[in-house]
């Protein structure tokens, strides 16, 4: 699991330093985070539990994404460009693994913040964990969506939006989508006999993996040499450096604090 956690960090560095194609960079990140979530999740909830998580996550996220492409709900009107590889219906295949990989990390950070040391959901944690984890995951989208849509056109918002060409509805839709699949999993997981990994590093591994999300917008700002303006689908022009600076700032004050909260709240090995 250390390997997969480290791979998540290195994939960001490699893709930015080598300017890899978006599909390749996305596949590297999605693959490393999904493998990490699979094995770390199995050590906590067993194989049946983590497979249930994956099935619900992929099913709900793909359904909501396709629904929004066709109807505008819940994210808004958009469509994917041609850079993201093969698709499941109207959604690129690598989107699902990203939902799972980042979703599982968000879930695990929420557990640490809420003091869930043993993985046994009970009482308020059944509902509090999905609520907090969904906020954590939406913070990640706040740092990537303007770049991935407005700058690189991996997906295109038909009517643009106030957040550098991204509509506010997108982030509300993200919260709804993530909350639904995490809440379904929480209701299922409370019946499981959780068996969290008791070896040293159980909490350090997801914190390392999530650090790739913490550093990504800052690296994007510092390593990119892109200048000038880009236009969204409505023709509104946005300065590339403004997008990179603001998303780095948003990440610094949203993604990083959640990571630090989890770091400070993580149960000590003797309690685990």
Cite the ranges covered by each PLM segment.
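Aromatic-rich, lipid-facing transmembrane alpha helices and their immediate juxtamembrane interface loops
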Residues: 1-272
């Amino acid at each position: 699991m250390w390997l997969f956690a480290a791979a998540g960090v290195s994939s960001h560095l490699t893709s930015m330093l080598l300017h890899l194609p978006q599909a390749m960079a996305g596949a590297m990140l999605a693959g490393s985070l999904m493998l990490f979530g699979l094995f770390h999740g199995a050590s906590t909830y067993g194989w049946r539990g983590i497979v249930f998580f994956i099935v619900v996550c992929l099913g709900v996220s793909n359904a909501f994404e396709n629904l929004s492409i066709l109807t505008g709900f819940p994210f808004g009107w958009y469509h994917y460009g041609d850079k993201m590889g093969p698709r499941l219906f109207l959604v690129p295949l690598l989107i699902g693994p990203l939902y799972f990989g980042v979703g599982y990390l968000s879930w695990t950070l929420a557990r640490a913040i809420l003091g869930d040391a043993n993985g046994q959901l009970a009482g308020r944690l059944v509902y509090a964990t999905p609520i907090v984890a969904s906020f954590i995951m939406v913070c990640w989208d706040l740092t990537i969506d303007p770049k991935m849509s407005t700058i690189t056109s991996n997906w295109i918002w038909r009517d643009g939006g106030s957040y550098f060409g991204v509509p506010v509805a997108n982030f509300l839709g993200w919260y709804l989508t993530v909350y639904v699949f995490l809440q379904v999993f929480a209701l299922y997981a409370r019946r499981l006999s959780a068996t969290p990994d008791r070896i040293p590093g159980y909490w350090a591994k997801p914190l390392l993996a999530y650090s790739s999300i913490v550093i990504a917008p800052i690296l994007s700002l510092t390593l990119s040499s892109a200048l000038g303006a880009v236009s969204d689908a409505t023709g509104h022009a946005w300065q590339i450096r403004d997008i990179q600076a603001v998303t780095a700032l948003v990440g610094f004050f949203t993604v990083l604090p959640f990571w630090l909260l989890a770091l400070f709240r993580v149960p000590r090995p003797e309690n685990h």
